Swiss-Prot record:
Main function: Catalyzes the reversible formation of acyl-phosphate (acyl-PO(4)) from acyl-[acyl-carrier-protein] (acyl-ACP). This enzyme utilizes acyl-ACP as fatty acyl donor, but not acyl-CoA.
Entries under SUPFAM superfamilies matching the protein: Isocitrate/Isopropylmalate dehydrogenase-like
Origin species: Streptococcus pyogenes serotype M6 (strain ATCC BAA-946 / MGAS10394)
Cellular component per GO, a single term: cytoplasm
Subcellular localization: Cytoplasm
Catalytic activity: a fatty acyl-[ACP] + phosphate = an acyl phosphate + holo-[ACP]
Name of this protein: Phosphate acyltransferase
InterPro entries in the cross-refs: FA_synthesis, Phospholipid_synth_PlsX-like
Length: 335
């Protein structure tokens, strides 16, 4: 049985979307037990009772505008902190939260703990593409500054995730850069390019420009956290703007526009479905001793369901256990 601890009070739509997502998961999968941390009265108002769902009551929660490290230190009984402690103490196998990203990174690092040999765990997310396959990208903001070693480890981590969780036999790894030529980029990117080229354990396809990301040029994209986060927000913003503009044009157009939109309705729906982030799951703080997954702050029921399903796959494949063994081998070699 897979035991998943969930911060029921994190996110814009908590606890409603969280609990309703749990209801769907319990119905869909018989091998999952859920621990919901938060206000019992509020949770119960949406929960379909099940012997595979436990509520751990707490009145305390970390707010979206709380200073992450300070909040984790001071709010010992916060729903997110208690969920992380359950993982550390072996009472749960993974944690999910749609709450404060910085706070989740803090509890991930300081409560759950990082795998020996991993210098800086990276925030990894599977981003949908027009091909329908998507790509894994890290780091998406766990670390504002990175070294060459960090980026090399992100390539290893990303490849490992793509193989074991997404089932890609030989994932192509690309380095996000300002040009495809090997001479492009700042010293960090140039040195990383050389290191990735020399590593025959990964399938490095070279530098990748941001404009190529959505075409599926690689299965794993490596970036420093600052740049990765900026690119992710740009992709999200562009998608929202395009869909909003399409809707405005259709609503304000004449009869010909509306007829055309009606004819294209199924195609537009398929495009939206292909690029829908809510079916891709959450962002994994990868490199920790257990799955720590951040669901989008505005997650709806579908996104919560997808995130729990994603964690189920991570536990099924024992990706973290395999990663611990992999880095233990590397540590022994380096020693």
């Amino acid at each position: 049985m897979k035991r998943i601890a969930i911060d029921a009070m994190g996110g814009d739509n908590a606890p409603k979307a969280i609990v309703e997502g749990v209801n769907q998961v319990i119905e869909a999968f018989s091998d999952i037990e859920i621990q919901l941390y938060g206000d019992q009265t509020k949770i119960n108002s949406y929960l379909i009772q099940s012997d595979r769902v436990a509520i751990i009551h707490t009145d305390e929660k970390i707010m979206s505008d709380d200073e992450p490290a300070k909040a984790v230190r001071r709010k010992k009984k916060a729903s997110m902190v208690l969920a992380a402690k359950a993982v550390k103490e072996g009472k749960a196998d993974a944690i999910i939260s749609a709450g404060n990203t910085g706070a989740l990174l803090a509890v991930g690092l300081f409560v759950v703990g990082r795998i020996k040999g991993v210098d800086r765990p990276g925030l990894l997310s599977t981003i949908p593409t027009v091909t329908g396959l998507g790509f894994d990208m890290l780091d998406l903001g766990a670390n504002a500054e990175n070294t060459v070693k960090h980026l090399h480890q992100y390539a290893i981590l990303g490849s490992f995730y793509a193989k074991n969780v997404r089932g890609i036999a030989n994932p192509r790894v690309g380095l996000l850069n300002n040009g495809t030529e090997e001479t492009k980029g700042d010293p960090l990117r140039k040195a990383t390019y050389e290191l990735l080229t020399a590593d025959n354990t990964i399938s490095f396809v070279g530098n990748v420009e941001a404009r190529e990301l959505m075409s599926g040029v690689a299965d794993v994209i490596v970036s420093d956290g600052f740049t990765g986060n900026a690119v992710l927000k740009s992709i999200e913003g562009t998608g929202i703007s395009i869909m909003g503009q399409l809707k405005q044009i259709i609503n304000s157009g004449g009869i010909k526009t509306k007829i055309g939109a009606s004819l294209l309705k199924s195609s537009l729906y398929e495009m939206k479905k292909t690029l829908d982030y809510s079916s891709a799951g959450g962002a994994v703080l990868f490199g920790l001793k257990a799955p720590v997954v951040k669901s989008h702050g505005s997650s709806d029921v579908k996104a919560i369901f997808s995130t729990i399903k994603q964690v189920r796959t991570m536990l099924d494949t024992n990706v973290v256990g395999q990663l611990v063994e992999e880095f233990a081998k590397e540590t022994q070699v380096n020693d």
